[in-house]
C-alpha cells in the first residue's frame, strides 16, 4: 500500500527530520500516487470525516532543506503568533489542528514550553490558539478557504496565568488575545482516511497529520 510505504519513509527520517536526496524524491512520488487512493476524495462534502483534533507529524515547505523540521524545536513566541506577541524564546512541543462544523472552526493549536527557569516555579507550559473559520470552494471539493481572525495565549498543564506571563516576559495587564486580519489562505486535503490526512497549502506547505484521540482544546 502506498500509505504504508509513505509512513515507513517518514519513520526513516534522520534525527533532524531530514531526508536524503533519494528519500525526498521518493516522498514526492508517493504523495502524488496516494492522491488517487483517498477513501474520501471530496472532504468538504464529508465534513464529519474531517472534523476533530489532528496532530501534525510532518511538514515541508517546498524543498528538501525545509522538509521535516523536528516536531519539537526551539522558536519564538513572535514567530509562532505571526508577530502578534513579543519574541520570547519558546520550545514548540507539537502542533495540532482542530476543525468543527460548528461555526466552521478551523483552528491551529501550538503547544509550547518556556525555557527552564523562566517561571518562578520552573518550566511554564502554554498553548497558542490561532482561530480561524473555513468555507468550501464550489469549484474544488478538496479546498478549505480559511480566514484566520484571532490569536490567543492560554496556560496549560497546571501552569498559572501569572507564571505564563512571567515566563514570556508579559506585563500583568498585557492582553492574551490579539485580533488579526491576514490575507485569506486555502488548504487542499488531497488525501483523507480515518487515520491520516495530507494537506497542501496555498503558500506551498505540505502537511501530514494523524487523527488524535484527545478532545479538542479550542472548540
Regions found by a protein language model. Give the residues of each.
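Soluble ligand-binding/transfer domains with enclosed cavities or grooves
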Residues: 2-219
Amino acid at each position: 500500500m502506498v500509505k504504508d510505504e509513505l509512513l515507513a519513509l517518514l519513520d526513516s527520517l534522520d534525527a533532524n527530520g531530514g531526508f536524503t536526496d533519494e528519500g525526498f524524491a521518493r516522498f514526492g512520488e508517493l504523495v502524488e500516487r496516494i492522491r488517487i487512493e483517498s477513501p474520501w476524495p471530496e472532504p468538504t462534502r464529508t465534513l464529519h470525516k474531517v472534523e476533530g483534533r489532528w496532530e501534525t507529524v510532518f511538514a515541508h515547505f517546498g524543498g528538501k532543506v525545509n522538509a521535516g523540521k523536528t516536531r519539537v524545536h526551539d522558536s519564538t513566541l513572535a514567530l509562532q503568533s505571526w508577530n502578534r506577541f513579543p519574541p520570547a524564546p519558546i520550545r514548540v512541543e507539537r502542533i495540532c489542528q482542530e476543525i468543527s462544523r460548528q461555526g466552521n472552526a478551523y483552528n491551529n493549536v501550538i503547544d509550547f514550553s518556556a525555557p527552564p527557569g523562566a517561571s518562578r516555579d520552573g518550566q511554564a507550559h502554554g498553548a497558542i490558539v490561532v482561530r480561524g473559520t473555513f468555507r468550501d470552494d464550489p469549484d474544488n471539493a478538496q479546498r478549505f478557504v480559511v480566514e484566520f481572525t484571532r490569536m490567543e495565549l492560554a496556560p496549560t498543564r497546571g501552569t498559572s496565568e501569572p507564571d505564563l506571563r512571567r515566563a514570556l516576559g508579559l506585563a500583568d495587564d498585557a492582553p492574551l488575545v490579539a485580533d488579526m486580519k491576514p490575507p485569506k489562505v486555502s488548504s487542499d486535503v488531497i488525501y483523507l482516511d480515518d487515520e491520516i490526512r495530507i494537506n497542501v497549502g496555498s503558500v506551498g506547505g505540505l502537511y501530514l497529520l494523524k487523527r488524535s484521540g484527545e478532545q479538542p482544546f479550542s472548540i
